[in-house]
C-alpha cells in the first residue's frame, strides 16, 4: 500500500477498481487543519482526467499493471503486435490505441500496458521518424518569419512543417505534442 507521502508523478494507483496514473501533485500544509495532497490523475482505461484530494496518511492501493515491449506488425481495423519475449500475437482495438495510430509504423517497438490481463494502452517513443509523402512546394519571399505548411506523412497524419521540407524527406515528430521537431539528415 502507498501512503500520500509516496505520491509522485507517474505513480500508478487503483481507485474504484480502475487503474490511474498521477499526472500532477501538490502537497499542501495549511496553517490550520491536517495536511493533504492535491492531485490530477488520469484513468488508464478511458483517459478521463480527475482532480482528487487525498488527506495526509490516507492509504492508496498500487495498480498491478504490467508493461511489455512489443513490435507493431500491421493494422486491419484492429492493431496487431508481437510480444518478442514469447512470440505471442496481441490485438488491440483502435479505441485502446487512440491517437498513437498516427505514429505507428511496421516493426516499431513500443510498450503495451496490461491491467488484470487486459491491454489498457501503449507508450510510444518520444520521437518518431516518418517520411513526408505529400506537401505543397514552399513559396519563398512572401513570409516574414516562421512560416509553415501542412505535410502528410507515411502514416496518413498531417503535421505542420517549415517551408524547406519537401516530399520524400524524413522528419522527426514529437509523439507527445504531435509537432514537427527536425528534418533528418539523409
Regions found by a protein language model. Give the residues of each.
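Acidic-enriched and Gly/Ser
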Residues: 2-154, 158-186
Amino acid at each position: 500500500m502507498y501512503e500520500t507521502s509516496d505520491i509522485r508523478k507517474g505513480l500508478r494507483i487503483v481507485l474504484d477498481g480502475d487503474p490511474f496514473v498521477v499526472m500532477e501533485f501538490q502537497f499542501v500544509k495549511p496553517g490550520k487543519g491536517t495536511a493533504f495532497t492535491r492531485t490530477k490523475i488520469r484513468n488508464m482505461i478511458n483517459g478521463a482526467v480527475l482532480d482528487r484530494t487525498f488527506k495526509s496518511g490516507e492509504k492508496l492501493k498500487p495498480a498491478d499493471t504490467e508493461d511489455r515491449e512489443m513490435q507493431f506488425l500491421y493494422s486491419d481495423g484492429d492493431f496487431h503486435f508481437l510480444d518478442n519475449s514469447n512470440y505471442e500475437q496481441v490485438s488491440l482495438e483502435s479505441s485502446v490505441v487512440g491517437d498513437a495510430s498516427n505514429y505507428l509504423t511496421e516493426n516499431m517497438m513500443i510498450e503495451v500496458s496490461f491491467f488484470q490481463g487486459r491491454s489498457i494502452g501503449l507508450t510510444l517513443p518520444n520521437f518518431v521518424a516518418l517520411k513526408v509523402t505529400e506537401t505543397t512546394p514552399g513559396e519563398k519571399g512572401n513570409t516574414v518569419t516562421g512560416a509553415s505548411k501542412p505535410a502528410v506523412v507515411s502514416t496518413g497524419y498531417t503535421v505542420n512543417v517549415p517551408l524547406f521540407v519537401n516530399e520524400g524527406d524524413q522528419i522527426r515528430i514529437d509523439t507527445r505534442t504531435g509537432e514537427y521537431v527536425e528534418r533528418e539528415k539523409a
